[in-house]
Amino acid sequence: MKYILRALGLAFGALIYTIGLDVFLVPNHVIDGGVVGIALMAAQLTGISFSVFIIILNIPFFIFGYKKIGAFFTVSSLFSILCLSGWSNFIHYEPVTSDPFLSTIYGGIIIGLGVGLIIRWGGSLDGTEVLAIIADRRTPFSVGETIMFFNLFILGSSGFVFSWDSAMYSLVAYFIAYKMIDVVTNGLDEMKGMLIVTGKHDQ
């Protein structure tokens, strides 16, 4: 039963992420970072489907993740990536807003929520998140901070493929997303700690 719940949680997180990406960001030329961003740029340059690139480009990262984190994480992450690839083939709605500023804010919040949920369920949606999770265990940097570090390089290079306006909006979206990832991955633990401290104080 717990495996079914985990699979549903991972699939739901991937769905949330896909909505943020395909409904808010991409239609307004604001892109994702990490391997997803690389896949979006590759799809733009070659005309090959994004869903193909997102699987192929993630394989080396998850081989590394298998060695460093384990089979359970790797399987969960591959399942999440397959869900993202599948959802992206079905979710192609008209953008909720044509305002790039609004799409940046809400898209960043939604994709951050989706990534955070997947991490809490033991998986990953992007190869750079594999490195971020390992860095979180071995360095003082949080998952969100490490992801943002990679995105500064990847999203900066997107200006050559799309436009510099798109690159700048994308950087803003990911500043919002990485804060949202931290809220989801660490916020519940911090809230539990506050409740424990408050309970002891009342006693």
Where are these regions (language model features)?
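Core subunits and conserved enzymes of cellular information-processing
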Residues: 1-201
